């Protein structure tokens, strides 16, 4: 039954809201009664109207999600000490195995940074590696060093620009964003490279970053393809853009 088919009373019998009883005259003005009941018994009313049917309202029931959320909150915050494991015990690896390897002092705790996990030698010599714990920013961690754990150089910081690092890209032109199409094309061209600041000379690779295959090289499209691309990038001029199109 739809909302406006009030004959069978989807929200209750249509006569109970208007106060009319069925009586013996079975079909009196059915449409007016249904219309009055439809608007008076509207369930989504603002506030409490005197026409709401209180005996038809469903009572609230406990959702199974409420119990699970309550149990989860009690497990995390209830017993008082469980949620403090990750937050307060980062200086020692006794509770949950997590350890703040970047901010610890030289207490000789375990392997120095990536030395133990990366297979660097002497990871268990705690007192010997204690001084190297704070020097993790450089490549000198632990006994074996972070370079021994796979040969990957440690990037100094996430905020260090590429032009300040040297060794990851051929950054003779500064940031790799500045490598326009042919400005540094000869740098990585034939695979000889420049070898800036003592890095190996084969960084240029097969074409390199600065060559014509740079990731942001200026591509020039000519001919019919250019006209087709330019026409497809812009909307037709006779097309009116209404704001509801963006919402839809």
Swiss-Prot record:
What protein am I looking at? Answer: Homeotic protein ultrabithorax
Ordered alphabetically, the record's keywords are: Activator, Developmental protein, DNA-binding, Homeobox, Nucleus, Repressor, Transcription, Transcription regulation
Residue ranges of the region described as Disordered: 116-191
Q: What does this protein do?
A: Sequence-specific transcription factor which is part of a developmental regulatory system that provides cells with specific positional identities on the anterior-posterior axis. Binds the consensus region 5'-TTAAT[GT][GA]-3'.
User: What family, per the record?
Assistant: Belongs to the Antp homeobox family.
Q: Which cell locations does it reside in?
A: Nucleus
User: What are the GO MF terms of this UniProt record?
Assistant: DNA binding
Q: Locate the motif Antp-type hexapeptide.
A: 241-246
* Biased segments, Low complexity type: 126-139
Task: Report whether Transcription shows up as a keyword of the record.
Answer: yes
Q: What GO cellular component entries does it have?
A: nucleus
Give the Gly residues compositional bias ranges: 116-125, 140-152, 182-191
